[in-house]
Amino acid sequence: MRNTNLEQRKKISGLSSERSDIILAGISIISCLLEATGAKKLITSGCGLREGLFFDYYSKENHVPIIANDILKMSRENVLNLYEPDQQHSRHITHLVLSMFDGWSELHGLRKNYRRLLETAALLHDIGITINFYSHARHSAYMILNAKLFGLTHKEQVITAAIAGWHNGVSKNYFKDRFYKELLSDANWKTINKLALLLALAESLDYTETSQIHVIEPGINKKTATLKLYAQGIPSIEMHQIQEHLSWFKKTFGVELKVQLATAAEE
């Protein structure tokens, strides 16, 4: 790069012509940093100096730590508050779906890292309602895909968006037709299918958005998976709604799902 002139650098693929005059100074700084730290790779941030200056100012003015303990948690809360869906419903759905993920770990066989992707998708699965209620799942997927969700790789953000979109009828073909389709393998799509199914089950268990079903107990034996529901009264609509996903469950996990409402004595 040092042996090129300005006109030659303007023709370098991937290098903005607006940066061709200052790129050498920037590269020199990065080169010194890598040499001083002994690092072998550099991960770039989507944020710039202006964001750093803002966070520094905000931290001092509001007396909050400048470094977040969980940057993904903070950024998804920002998105959730920005679009203001029914947060009680979103948080309840998240509680239910994480109970399934933990209780059926042997069944789905997924790494714990996917738990935070599922949690993010569940919290934000309804933000698309701000655009259109009837096709909100697709809009939620698009909004998650383009949101400032720090703490996720590009691939993880696509997976999170696909989970939120697929749980309510958006097929994987919608995502496979987009330019980022090459990010996801067939194995990724199988994972997304499992997580989208769990989110769909959780959504059906609060279909009336009243949190009537407050606790669930997922279980598994050799031939079936079980789901015991603890509710206030008889959640007839939710009990009916979950039936729509039983065939999807059997196709995905290869076992029947038995749903049982706990008796008053069990509660």
Over which residues does each language-model region extend?
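Helical "lid/coupling" subdomains associated with nucleotide-phosphate turnover
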Residues: M1-L201, L205-E209, I216, I220-L227, ...
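Flexible glycine-/small-residue-rich
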Residues: A122, L229-A231, L261
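Short solvent-exposed loop/turn micro-motifs enriched in small/polar/acidic residues
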Residues: E209-Q212, T252
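Short, surface-exposed beta-strand/loop "edge" segments at domain boundaries and coil↔beta transitions
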Residues: G233-I237, E267
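Short, non-transmembrane amphipathic alpha-helical segments
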Residues: I237-L257
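A short amphipathic beta-strand at an alpha->beta junction
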Residues: F253-E267
